[in-house]
């Protein structure tokens, strides 16, 4: 027997129709279903608008998915979250601590390289990577910011779904370039090289400025290392 034939699946057109009906019925039964997953990191130097862009993105997610919960080290005003439950991010253990079924969990981690430092990449607990790799099944979405792409540990970067390169002009015109993580190559200076880019242009607003504390200091939340030892 040629066991490779076991790789073949159905070629019955009726199965296509039944699969479509199944998925439509599933979404009807679960209107709270959270579509985003994987890791999206906003990158750029200080003043590039990366935190502003990440906060706006999360606020829009909250508007579209009101049943999600948010775990963050950025103090976003509850008024702009529309009633979405918000919890403070306290460390890597939160990635497995918070679950919300089909309704989803968003982790917004400003300066994410503080947690996933490339200089400590050899000490990353495999359990953490396993948790990250299973985000899609658990409807979890990690949104982070980082000044330099390659300061984030490589095992973590390899799990990226998207990276967003941020810059702004005159302090109010935002230009963000979206690239797929699988298409990214990083040079020695930490610059992301890719041919597949989608750009977004938008203006800053006073509302988004007031939505969070732009001058808050991000501290290292974990004092325990990835392998259980002290950092």
Question: Predicted segment positions?
Answer:
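N-terminal pre-Walker A segment at the start of P-loop NTPase domains
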Residues: 1-32
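P-loop (Walker A) phosphate-binding loop of NTP-binding proteins
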Residues: 45
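Hydrophobic anchor at the beta1->P-loop junction of P-loop NTPases
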Residues: 42
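Conserved lysine of the Walker
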Residues: 50-51
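Conserved P-loop NTPase motor module
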Residues: 182-231
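Conserved nucleotide-sensing/catalytic segment adjacent to the nucleotide-binding pocket
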Residues: 79-138
């Amino acid at each position: 027997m040629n066991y490779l034939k076991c790789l073949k699946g159905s070629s019955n057109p009726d199965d296509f129709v039944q699969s479509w009906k199944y998925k439509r019925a599933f979404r009807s039964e679960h209107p709270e279903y959270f579509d985003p997953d994987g890791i999206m990191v906003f990158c750029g130097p200080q003043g590039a608008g990366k935190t502003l862009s990440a906060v706006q993105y999360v606020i829009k997610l909250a508007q579209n998915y009101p049943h999600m919960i948010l775990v963050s080290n950025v103090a976003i005003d509850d008024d702009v979250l529309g009633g979405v439950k918000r919890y403070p991010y306290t460390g890597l253990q939160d990635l497995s601590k918070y679950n919300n079924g089909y309704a989803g969990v968003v982790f917004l981690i400003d300066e994410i390289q503080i947690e996933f430092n490339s200089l400590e990449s050899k000490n990353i607990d495999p359990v953490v990577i396993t948790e990250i790799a299973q985000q899609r099944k658990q409807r979890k979405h990690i949104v982070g910011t980082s000044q330099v792409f390659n300061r984030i540990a490589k095992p973590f970067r390899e799990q990226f779904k998207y990276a967003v390169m941020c810059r702004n002009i005159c302090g109010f015109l935002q230009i963000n370039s979206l690239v797929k993580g699988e298409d990214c190559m990083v040079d020695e200076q930490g610059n992301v090289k890719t041919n597949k880019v989608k750009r977004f242009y938008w203006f800053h607003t006073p509302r988004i400025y007031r939505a969070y504390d732009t001058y808050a200091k991000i501290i290292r939340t974990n004092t325990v290392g990835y392998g259980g030892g002290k950092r």
